[in-house]
Amino acid sequence: MKKRNRFTRGKFRTRRPPGTMNETEQAYSEVLNELQRTGAILEWRYEPLTFRLADNTRYTPDFIVQYPDGAMEVHEVKACKRTGGFLAEDDAMVKIKVAAEMYPWFRWFLCGKLPKCAGGDWKFREI
C-alpha cells in the first residue's frame, strides 16, 4: 500500500495505516492495560468505531473504554505542549467537539502526554 503524505506547517507528515498506533497512543494503551489488570476498567478497544458527523465527514476516535458499571468513554490521545495545552489541528478539535454533541451517551476526553521536561505525566480534559 502506498503511503500518502500531508504537508502540514512546513513539514511532511506520513499517514499511518489504519489500526496502527503512534508512540503516544501505544504509551496510553499501556496505561489502559494496567487499569484493566487492576479492574478499574472492564475493557478497551483501539479505533473500534467510526462516527458519521455529516455527509462525507467521519470521525474515528483513538480509544473506547468500558467501565465495570457499563459506562462508556471515548478517549482521544494527543501530545501536549510543555505548558499543558494539547497539540491538535483545528479541524480535529472541531470534529471531536461535534461528535461529543451528536453522541452524548459517551463521555468524551482528550488525553495528552506531557513532555519529559514537563514531568511526562498524563493530562485529561473532558470535552
Residue locations for each model-derived region?
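Electrostatic, structured charged patches in enzyme active sites and in nucleic-acid/phosphate-binding
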Residues: 1-127
